[in-house]
């Protein structure tokens, strides 16, 4: 896509008598000419009391600014939206693109020479990475870290992986309300920070470090540790070096860096959401990343970090074993060690002297937990453009399975978006299904829901839970929380709402999954599939005005990263004009 542009930076002129308006506005906030003589550094801080992952960002932001002042800069802090999936009434993937656009416009248009970005959660880290890749001013991320583990009856527990497990046991009748209340109050939610497993939030923080966008060791430090404050202050100092040395995101976000990040994803059993996010970031950086890259790298990368949900320990325990740095040190023979990072050094230099402190948690390459990365891309008549299976979180006996389809009802709210399906409705609809059925959930994709909510591991019927069934094959066009587990075929593309074959599956149709062979097929004659598709009509759009309408008009499909067409396709307007 050619060389990345170097953006113009407007600076405060202390001598020009006609530039007094800008100087005056800065003085109005209490700053002086002495301050304005320094390089202005933006501090992007999405602090919010509607996001426990960002609740501690006032302290982290102050630490970043201390570092900038100490290194000779002039920090000016600005906010953006802040997203926690639990608080929103709609999938926060919709707002990833909004946060990316607002962040990139602030960075691009303000008189700042570099920027430090604070983020913790599922969509915030990718949004900021998309923004800094687009603007290409010197930038560095400091992540918020993981919350501490909880304890319940002598067991280490963490949300939301263990939340899912306890919820199913409650529905099966093996534990009662008192136990559910106790583990909620005393086990899952002890501190601020990301959910304490390798869910999407900790996965994207690890992704940022693996890409080289943070200082070494940043990803795994728990949110409430003093070392997290120290890291924030060091990041403030480091942005000044990046500005002075003119190190830009385009120097860091190379194809090799993205392949390194995918390897770390596979080695840690990280969230499948990284497939969407890494593709989106890569395309902003001019790197053509595809599902085939994930398949190729997964096959050649062992799963070595025994961290939940695919393993047995929390991210706090992973930190004490050496963290993501130690994972990358172990993976060194498989990584491109020459890549530049935000430390101003190569990855090889960053990892000098790093050791694994607990090989029971971070396994050596000679003794992996699994020989491959635990993610498969499947294609076939049900997913012509591909789908994703997290085999590391699946039941091995279900990864090759053929069974009849059982279609879950398409619940909608009054305004037309996807609603939740209650356990009672699941029990009513599925009262006669067996564990051999394949549960199908559709119209939950980027456009259909809209926003691809994390509904992949939808609930199982109570009669099967009471029989001891805890997993079934599920096929969906939505996403799955990185904290979840189960045999779920995700991100089916094209999605049902745009006329993918998933839209015309009928109850009782046989569906065949062979994850190892990379196949997902609807065992219906091709002529019958085409007949059904010809008779199919698309659903009406849920929104006709506002930002959500823009999302519906512009979002790409999952294999393209769910970014907006106009952000990644320079010829989009011409293509639209030709169609008209």
Regions found by a protein language model. Name each.
Residues 108-128, 139-143:
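A short, small-residue-rich loop immediately preceding and capping a beta-strand
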Residues 2-55, 60-81, 86, 92-95, ...:
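Catalytic or ion-coupling anion/metal-binding cores of large enzyme and transporter domains
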Residues 98-110:
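Short, well-structured alpha-helical segments in soluble
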